[in-house]
Structures are given as structure tokens and as C-alpha cells.
């Protein structure tokens, strides 16, 4: 942790930033679901499959979904990208944390006022976590990587791609649960609100990070 004297921004280790992002994002996904407001958009499709086919955990279905996102990016790039495979590994760690937090989340109180707080906290943390991931200078989890890379490929601003990606995930989740379970599951008012606003929330969090921090991966120093 160093102070960049040129612009007074604090320099932080990129690897540490990535680890923090993975932990808070996985915790926030579980916390948002626990709040009763619905699953976050980035995990809504794996959630639908975990409810329809519960022999595999949410974390496992997340890993499968992330693999499909990586394959899609390689198809769009029309070449093999080595860093995408590291992103796949990071996604596996994220999936394991999802299952870990699911084991212990029930320890938290479930009163309505608490659940409102859980949604607010999870929303803010996801925005910070995604913004942190996008700036750590390292491959990030595929659900965060996909909108960022797609934005670069098709030359459309990130916030618009992020919102479109989230809304598409929710639409797929609604259709999957409706046909596989007979009713729409996992989607709540919080899910819809987050899907249509989180792109901007991530942008605001990113502006704050850019103003106050600079991230340098340790591997780039050597």
C-alpha cells in the first residue's frame, strides 16, 4: 500500500483488490437473496437451474454459467485468450464462496427491517465489488468480465451493456423458472431495481475509486 505522490492517490495491490472483490461479491449475492428482495441479476440464471435441478448447488451452476460466458467471449474474439482461463479459475473460487456463505447466512436475523438493510448493503457492496474488479488489473470473474469485454468488443459504453446484460439474465430466469418450476422464482422488486440501476451504481463507485486509488498487480512489478 503506497501513496502515489504525483496525484495523491493510494496505490493498492491488485491481487488483494481482486480477492476482496470476489469475497464481497459472493457474500452480497447470497445476502441479496436472503433479504427476500430477489437474487442479483448476475446469479439469477444459475439460481434458476439450482432451484429446478437441486442436485447441483448454486455455486456449481454458477461455475457452469460462467464457463458458457467465457466460451461466448472467445467466440466473439475469434481467438483463444489466456487471461479468460484465469478468469474461469477466479470464477470457480467465487462459486465456492457462494456455497460457503449459503451455509451460514441463516444465522442472520430475518425481521423485515433487517431484510431491507440487507438489500441496501448488498446492492452497495455489489456495485463496489464490480467496480473494484474492473480496476484491479487482473482477470476477474466471468459474470463481471463478460459485460466489460462485450463493451470493448462492440464499442458501446459499459453502463448500457451492464444494464442490458442484467435485464437479459432476469428475462431468461423468469422464463426458466416459469417453464421448469411452473412459477416465476427468485425475482423480486429488489432484483428489478438493481438490474435497471446497477450499471450506473457501478459507474459511480468506479469514479470514486479512480479519484482516490490506483491498483497495481504485484505480478506486474516483477
Protein language model features and the residues they cover:
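Core subunits and conserved enzymes of cellular information-processing
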Residues: 2-222
